[in-house]
């Protein structure tokens, strides 16, 4: 049985009873937790404030919306997930959840997340949440991911919108502050994802997903990571210069950014194995979390 037949036959396997854990995994909990955290930062950094109960509802809606997008992404990508070592244990691939069941679950969650955001919070945040879900599923997952080398650059906008949604849920508007939060994640996403693609290159090549290392090679990808790392360093300092944060943020963000640059330079000159790419990938996760944590604690 070849790879294509194996992936097509996923829809014909006998499925065991699904568990709560399977549905949690279907929602990509690691991604969802980062989405909720950055969404909270957007709420915290907004000039106004919400009633605590409404704030919790907004965060739940953001979480459910992110989970719905993750579930539909797994439904659509089940064929290539079956071919990649990194994703072969996902619920649909290993037969824990049926494909149609996953799609229904994702669509229902998407509807309720947007509906309750509009009903309980405000229309703008609901509209932004709907756009984010649509963008991630239709623009990134169904179109760009398998067709463009710039898939993660353009598609990364979806992952950068949660703080904008959080900000809008409190203020009812989109401002320069929320755009800067968007830009930090938007510029962070390509180097983070390309580092992953460097040490998962064989998987992406096998699935014919046009990630940059597959199409342009490792050296070109490392150059792009370095360029984006410089842009990220500059962008991460913007909150101080527009009055969002204090001098403590500026100093620590600069140090974190310099370390990010150090890892990207080390990666560029590394010709051995994938260890440096894995180190860079791990640090990039820590970096984004700590930058937003700093913004929360150092807001003006």
UniProtKB/Swiss-Prot annotation:
It is an enzyme of class 2 (transferase). Keywords: Cell inner membrane, Cell membrane, Heme biosynthesis, Membrane, Transferase, Transmembrane, Transmembrane helix. It catalyses: heme b + (2E,6E)-farnesyl diphosphate + H2O = Fe(II)-heme o + diphosphate. It is a multi-pass membrane protein. The keyword Lipid biosynthesis does not apply. It is found in: Cell inner membrane. Its main location: membrane. Pathway: Porphyrin-containing compound metabolism; heme O biosynthesis; heme O from protoheme: step 1/1. One of its GO terms (molecular function) is protoheme IX farnesyltransferase activity. One of its GO terms (biological process) is heme O biosynthetic process. The keyword Membrane applies. It comes from the Bacteria. The chain crosses the membrane at residues 31-51, 52-72, 92-112, 123-145, 152-172, 179-199, 225-245, 247-267, 280-300. Its EC number is 2.5.1.141. One of its GO terms (cellular component) is plasma membrane. It holds the Pfam family UbiA. NCBIfam families: cyoE_ctaB, PRK04375.1-2. Belongs to the UbiA prenyltransferase family. Protoheme IX farnesyltransferase subfamily. Converts heme B (protoheme IX) to heme O by substitution of the vinyl group on carbon 2 of heme B porphyrin ring with a hydroxyethyl farnesyl side group. Carbon 2 of the heme B porphyrin ring is defined according to the Fischer nomenclature. This is Protoheme IX farnesyltransferase. It comes from Rickettsia bellii (strain OSU 85-389). The gene is ctaB.
């Amino acid at each position: 049985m070849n790879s294509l037949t194996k992936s097509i036959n996923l829809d014909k396997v006998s499925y065991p009873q699904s568990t709560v854990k399977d549905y949690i995994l279907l929602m990509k909990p690691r991604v969802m937790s980062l989405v909720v955290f950055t969404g909270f930062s957007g709420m915290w950094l907004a000039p106004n404030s919400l009633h605590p109960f409404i704030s919790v509802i907004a965060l739940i809606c953001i979480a459910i919306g992110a989970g719905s997008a993750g579930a539909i992404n797994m439904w659509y990508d089940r064929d290539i997930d079956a071919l990649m070592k990194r994703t072969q244990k996902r619920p649909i691939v290993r037969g824990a959840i049926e494909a149609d069941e996953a799609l229904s679950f994702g669509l229902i969650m998407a509807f309720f997340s947007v509906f309750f955001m509009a009903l309980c919070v405000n229309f703008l945040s609901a509209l932004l949440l709907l756009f984010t879900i649509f963008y991630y599923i239709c623009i990134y997952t169904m179109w760009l991911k398998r067709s463009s080398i710039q898939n993660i650059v353009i598609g990364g906008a979806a992952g950068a919108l949660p703080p904008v949604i959080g900000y809008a849920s409190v203020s009812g508007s989109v401002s320069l502050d929320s755009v800067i939060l968007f830009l930090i994640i938007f510029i962070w996403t390509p180097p983070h994802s390309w580092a992953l693609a460097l040490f998962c290159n064989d998987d992406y090549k096998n699935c014919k997903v046009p990630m940059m290392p597959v199409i342009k090679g490792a050296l070109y990808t490392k150059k792009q990571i370095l360029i984006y790392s410089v842009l990220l360093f500059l962008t991460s300092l913007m909150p101080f210069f527009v009055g969002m944060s204090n001098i403590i943020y500026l100093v620590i963000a600069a140090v974190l950014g310099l370390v990010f640059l150090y890892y990207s330079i080390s990666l560029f000159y590394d010709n051995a194995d994938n260890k440096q790419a894995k180190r860079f990938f791990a640090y990039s996760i820590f970096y984004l979390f700590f930058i937003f944590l700093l913004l929360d604690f150092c807001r003006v």
